[in-house]
Amino acid sequence: MAEGSYGFLCREDGSWWRSWLQQSYTSVRDKSAEALEFMKRDLNEFTRVVQHDTACTIAATASVVKEKLVVEGSSGTTEKVKKGLSDFLGVISDTFAPSPDKTIDCDVITLMATPSGTTELYDSTKARLYSLQSDPATYCNEPDGSPAEFDAWLAYWDPEQRKAEISEPLVTSPSIRALFTKMVPAAVSHSEFWQRYFYKVHQLEQEEARRDALKQRANQSVHSEEPKWEEEEEDFVGAALTPALKLKEKCVISPPTIPTLHVEDKSEKTAELNRDHTSVTSPSESSESISPITQIANPEYIEQTSSKDPSLCTLTVTKEKIAAETDKSSAPVEQTGKSNAQMGTHREDPPSDLRVFELNSDSGKSTPSNNGQKGSSTDVSEDWEKDFDMTEEEVQMALSGVEVSGEVEDEDWENWE
């Protein structure tokens, strides 16, 4: 029992393998046959195109050379040679010349051979029309496009009114005449033949019109865009220059017209003015150089002169006189009055609320030296402390002198006005 079942399974496996191999062989054979057919078709088409192009080129070249060899008034021997060569080229041209229905399709120009052996140049429109006329599918198949458009065109097409248009292609085109003779009425009727042909011509004209419109539109867009770019650049430059001109008009600087007042005083006074607000810099190292400028801020003087014209007072005092003033503390008020009497006024510099004192060092006190070397900052500060060592009573008397000098200055201003 087991042996019988095993033999049955072996037979089934063998039949399955045979059927699978048969199917695989059949599919491979069919695909190979299809591939071979495609290859044959491509090779035939390639060979036909090459032969057609070569024949047309040889025919055109032979025709041109044959025409150039025809020379009037030549000698007998030369004429015989040229005639023999011309005949040889004529044979080549007749052998390789294609039929009038065959053309060389180019992008713009088509070279067509005529029955007389010459060639004519066709543009793209004429080449398409010639291809349409020589194609049997134009008359046998239904027109391309929607049937509604074809029916609408047929509504306005009348064969009786188109007799002249129908007779013209029969006379001028040998390909249409040959196809008309073969196909009418065996394949198509007379009306269908001409309806399909003229509708295809109508579609070709519409396509050419659309192409011309696209070319014109592209040319117009190119010409119209160039001036716009220039106008945009001009507008941008003008917009960039306008704010700059406005800023130049607004930014006009007027010269200063505020009168100023200079007061120079070389008197022996003004050493005790505002000790609390005095900022004294160290004197110069050489006895003949001019010391840095000392600035003294006087708030009371600023308040008194706020309602009047501001002025700048420059007082020149030597250090020897300042040292002498430290010993003479008995009459600061009288000395201040004398100094105010010697003040001179000049209108030159811009206004200021500070009094600037310029100290000229005439003595060697500010430049102590150690073995011919420059003195240190501590020695200079000690000398200044000795020169300006004052008691509290002397400071109060100096402040009272400043107040009195302010009153005298006000009187001088009134007299000056």
UniProtKB/Swiss-Prot annotation:
GO terms for cellular component: cytoplasm. Residues 332-343, 360-379 have a biased composition (Polar residues). It holds the Pfam family BSD. Residues 153-205 form the BSD domain. It comes from the Eukaryota. Residues 262-278, 345-356 have a biased composition (Basic and acidic residues). Residues 281-292 have a biased composition (Low complexity). Residues 380-390 have a biased composition (Acidic residues). Residues 215-234, 262-292, 323-390 are annotated as: Disordered. Gene3D superfamilies: BSD domain (1.10.3970.10). PANTHER family: BSD DOMAIN-CONTAINING PROTEIN 1, SYNAPSE-ASSOCIATED PROTEIN. This is BSD domain-containing protein 1-B. The lineage of its organism: Eukaryota, Metazoa, Chordata, Craniata, Vertebrata. The gene is bsdc1-b.
